[in-house]
Regions:
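Non-catalytic interaction/clamp surfaces of large macromolecular machines
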Residues: 112, 120-132
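Hydrophobic alpha-helical hairpins/lids featuring a short glycine-rich hinge
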Residues: 106-114
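Noncatalytic partner-interaction/assembly domains of nucleic-acid and motor enzyme complexes
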Residues: 1-105
């Protein structure tokens, strides 16, 4: 499944099932989303949650406006999630979506590390033991 689809499904699930955030908040951080806009929405959602507020579309949108008005305007708010709200039928899958996002994030981190190590290997005089 495409990363953006999973990320949108998770965000929609969090709005539909307020209990899911309890399981997801310890697993994901905003920077783990491949789409920075999704991470921005998640950050606004979790910031509200951490202040003991029940996040909904209106509160999250207001939080986004406060956090970064320019970014909020550039991305057009969270209106594009409204389509996803109609397609996400099983909000109980939020934890599975979060685990998949986490898995993709770990793979991206590993890829970045391997590219860095490959670059080190190609430099003259590199000690192979230090690279490993």
């Amino acid at each position: 499944m495409e990363k953006n689809v999973i990320e949108r499904a998770l965000l929609c699930s969090l709005f539909l099932d307020q209990v899911a955030i309890l399981e997801v908040v310890g697993l994901l951080r905003p920077e783990m989303f491949s789409d920075p806009d999704h991470g921005f929405i998640y950050e606004a959602f979790t910031d509200l949650f951490n202040r003991n507020k029940r996040p909904d579309l209106i509160l999250v949108e207001e939080e986004m406006k406060k956090k970064d008005p320019e970014r909020y305007l550039k991305m057009g708010g969270i209106a594009y999630l409204s389509d996803g709200m109609e397609t996400v039928r099983l909000e109980h899958n939020a934890v599975e979506y979060a685990r998949e996002i986490f898995r993709h994030y770990l793979l991206a981190c590993m890829h970045k590390l391997f590219v860095q190590k490959a670059s080190e290997c190609l430099q003259y005089g590199t000690d192979c033991h230090k690279v490993i």
